[in-house]
Amino acid sequence: MGIESIIELIETLRGKDGCPWDRKQTPQTILAYLLEETYELMDAVESDDPAEICGELGDVLFHIFFLISLFNEKGYFGIKDVVGQNEEKMIRRHPHVFGKDTVGSVEDVKKRWYQIKMEEKNVSSETSILDSIPASLPALMRAYRISERAARTGFDWEDVTGVTEKVEEEWSELKTELRRQKEPGKDHRRLALEFGDILFTLVNVARFINIHPETALRDATNKFERRFKHMEKRIAESKRDMRSVSQNEKDAMWEEAKDSIG
């Protein structure tokens, strides 16, 4: 089966004698499923299982083709338009490969890519360079993109030391607010803002040391999950409930998990 076969399959599903569920779908409903499938693909990539990755890639592609078919039905565009526009864009944004431009480093490539992208979008001095960053991005990823984009204008710390000092400053402000919250009648809005400031500044630390915060947090969460499940298993093997085990014993099991599974 190839691309044409998938398109024909979707057309059959959407046809008069097709599936009621498929015929009912809209771009908005398919978008929700596409997002879910994308997260499942991310899990598969994390598992490093080629067979699983292959299957999840197929699911993502199917939903992308489904979206294209929905717009093709209305006469807006088809698969050739999507592929053609993307091919032209990639060639245009790689002038050092398909043109006469020369680049000296990966950073040069990124700068040239951004410059071409802004020219394509016809961004003027009256338009914010942040406007093209989707508001629907996950908060951590959006913070990374916004800080990265702002830094390209020269609005940035000189080095990572400046950012880490800012983290310490924001941490101090959060601790001050935590002490204030002990007073009666205080709401948590300011506390949430101070906590957000720390997160945003930590995102900038990640940017300076070339670590994507989304990936780093996902890895840390996965590590915690592995250790916690190890601890749960050990407690279950002893025929006990988590709540019946003392904190000291849990701490010991946690250290054991760190040593045995990392």
Where are the model-predicted features located?
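Flexible "arm" and connector segments at domain edges
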Residues: 1-56, 62-195, 200-262
